[in-house]
Amino acid sequence: MGIADSMKKAAFSTAFSYIGKNPEENAPKLMAWVDKFAGDGPNSFPTQRAAVRKVINDKDNNMHHLVMDIMKDTDPEVLKATFMNFFLNANIIGWPKQEENRKKYGCNIPWAILLDPTSACNLHCTGCWAAEYGNRLNLTFDEIDSIITQGKELGVYMYIYTGGEPLVRKKDLIAICNKHSD
């Protein structure tokens, strides 16, 4: 991580600590700070920021209540990791790297990678596509690690696990999340 990214991380960590003290009062102030920080360029997510701002400012909005409940009821460390990984890594740091690599390689770089660690499942849901492929298809820990490492080099920090039932591989997934905590 370069100096600029380290400074962004420190700023976001401070901002998160600030909002956590009183989410209802501090969320609009934080959003104003994010607007200044993001700027007005094409990669500044203006549509997404407007949607977040609308939810934060409209106290009668159901999403506002949901967000505030999540902020108040979720373990602070879990909330901080989610905030840092989603907003900072996957968007503020990741998006410019993705844009750079799109131009460099002349192809799309996804914002998120959908990863199926296993086709195994213990749920037997009606109509599930995974059942059609059997339950013996598995990515190794090293293969999952390689996919995530390569993705991060391209600016991808968001991974969505599907399957099968991903938690059949619970130990591996926890280990991979610990290894790639960003």
Where are these regions (language model features)?
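Auxiliary Fe-S-binding modules of radical SAM enzymes
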Residues: 1-66
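Conserved alpha-helical substructure of the radical SAM core
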Residues: 38-179
